[in-house]
Amino acid sequence: MPVAALYDIHGNLPALEAVLEDVARAGADRVVVGGDVVPGPMPCETLVRLLELELPFQFIVGNGELAVLAEMNGRDSGAPARYRDSIRWNAAQLHPSEGELLAAWPTTLHMNMRGIGKVLFCHATPQNPNDVFTRVTPDDRLVSIIGETDADMVVCGHTHMQFNRMIGGLRVVNAGSVGMPFGDPGAYWLLLGPDSSIEQNTTWRWRRREFGRPIIPRLKNSPQITFCILHQRKRC
C-alpha cells in the first residue's frame, strides 16, 4: 500500500497539481497531508482540490493551520510580525465550515507499513508543530523533542527541506515541501512503499516534480505572493 506524504503545500495549487500527477505515476494508493496546507496564495482552491482526491486521504494539522484558526477565532496567531498580514488574509478567505474542518485535523497519525514497520506522521514533532530541527541538530536534542515513541519511522515536515536521520533504531525522514521548498526549485514529496515508476525495489523514496513558468501568473494574481517571498527570504 504505497502512501504519498505531502507536506507544506502552503496554498500553492499549481505545485500541488504537479505533485498529484507524480503521485499517480508512482502508484500511490493513499495520501497523507502533513499540515500547512495554508497559509499561502490560493488557500481555498488548494483545500478544495485535496478534498476532491479520488484516493483515500488523511490530514494532520500544522502550525500554519493553527495560526489561521487562531485568527479566525479572534485570538492572537502568535505568528511573527512579517507573516501576520498573510495569516489575516488567509483567515478572511476561509469559510467558517472550512475552519471547522481544519480544527478537526489531528496532530499525529499512526500507520503500519510492510517493509517499514510502525510509521508516525507529525508536522514537526509529535509534541509541537512549531518545533524546528534539521539534518545537523544534535542527536540528544532530537531525541528530547521527539519524545518516547515505539515507531520505526517518524515522517515530518515544517522546515521545508528533505533529510534522513537515524537515531538509534528510529529513522526520521523529512518529506520536504510541495509548495514552498528551501533549496532547488520544484515540488518535493515522499513516497512510502514501492514506487511503480522505477524497477528498483524501495521501501521509501523522495520525489521531486518540476513545473513550468506558465503557472507563475496564477500565483502572482494573489496578494499573498508576498508571503512566499518573505518565507523564502527567511532562510537567507
Language model region names:
Residues 153, 165-236:
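Acidic, His/Gly-rich catalytic cores of divalent-metal-dependent hydrolytic chemistry
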